Structures are given as C-alpha cells and as structure tokens.
Amino acid sequence: MPTLNDELKTFILSKGASLVGFADLHEIDTEARDGFPFGITIAIALNPQVMSKIKDGPTAAYYEEYKILNEILDNLGSATAQWLIDKGYKAKARPATFSEDKANLSAKLPHKTVATRAGLGWIGKCALLVTKRFGSAIRLTTVLTDAPLVAGKPVNESLCGHCTHCVDACPAHAHTGTIWQAGMPRQALYDAFKCREKARELSKKSFGETVSLCGLCIVACPWTKKYLEKAANKIR
C-alpha cells in the first residue's frame, strides 16, 4: 500500500516537478519554519537549451524562463499545500522567490536549506544548491507542513572539493571559495550585494532589464555541464 510519502511524491511529480524531497526541520529555529516540523522541497530543472546559451551573462530567454518557472512553482506549491490540507493536515506554501531580510538579501528559511535537509544536494561555493542530476540548473520552492513525512537523509558536507569553476566564472568576484558545511552563514560563501550589483549591470546591458539575474556560476558548474551535455546528446 502506498505511503503518504509515495502518494505525495507521485502527485507532485505528476504536476511537472523534476525533484521532490522531504525534510525534517526540527533542528531549525521554530520561528524560521513558522512552527511546522517538516518541509517539502519541489524543484524544476531549468531548460537546458536556454541555459546552454548563457556565455557572457544573462539572456532575455533566461529571464523569461526564470519568470515562467517561478509561476509554475508557486502554483505547484499551492496545489501541494491544498493536497495536504484536503488530507487533514496543515500546510503552507512559500513563494518561489522572496527576500524577508532586506538588510542581507535573504530569507529566514531559504529553499536551498530545506533542500539540503531533504537530501537533494549540497550548497556549492556559489552559495546555490548543487544536485547530482541537474547541477545548479534548478528553481526551488518549499511547502511547510505538519504531515508525518519520512524525511530524507540530510546532506551536511559539500562535494565540491577543490573545484573553483563557479568562483572563477563570477564577474563580480563575489565568492570567497569557501567550502560549505551545514549551518554555515551565507556571508562566508559570497557577497550577495556584489552579486546583485553585477547581475543588474549585466542584465541591463544584455536585454534592457535591471534584474538580479546572471547565471554564469550556474553554467560553470561541472555538475550543471553534465546535465546540459546529457540533454544536448538526446537532441542530436
């Protein structure tokens, strides 16, 4: 007989998700998780054809992809929360993109933090989630719930090793090159303000929009390159 995990994962994947993970959030500050004990990470892979065109900075196609996936994720998060509510549980979907702490350009509970607790990947030197299947070429959202889910095994250490591809690719020189470990503050990995400033400069130059979007560290990652190459080989 299918478990709650099985039923929920099947539902989310059927709606277009690329990855789904379940996280135990008990060790995270209660306020940050709005009192919910579990989190669901939903990920959708970025279009490999769009990402492969990023060479010197963000493109208009990447910006459109970013907006489309954010809308899809918001709808998917809401649908997931409603599915749980219909089952008699409490649930709350969080927006795909938001910043609660304007002083640090951060959220009180980042999607990528929940994703590492769910076992989907680790945080790279670019301060983004890295997955074995898609690299960093994904967008994320989170649903918080009190449903008694069986959580995945948390990832607490980086697999980046000596690799510095994302650090070297950053035109803002925003990354420190520090290897991530669970609980490490984001500031130890990169300067969000340097990243934002350069991204806005590049997007304005590329397609006339001042947005905090770049993509160079994403496509520089060897794990992302594996995903893009695999996708390209399928097309050939």
Predicted stretch roles:
Residues 30, 68-236:
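Catalytic cores of enzyme domains
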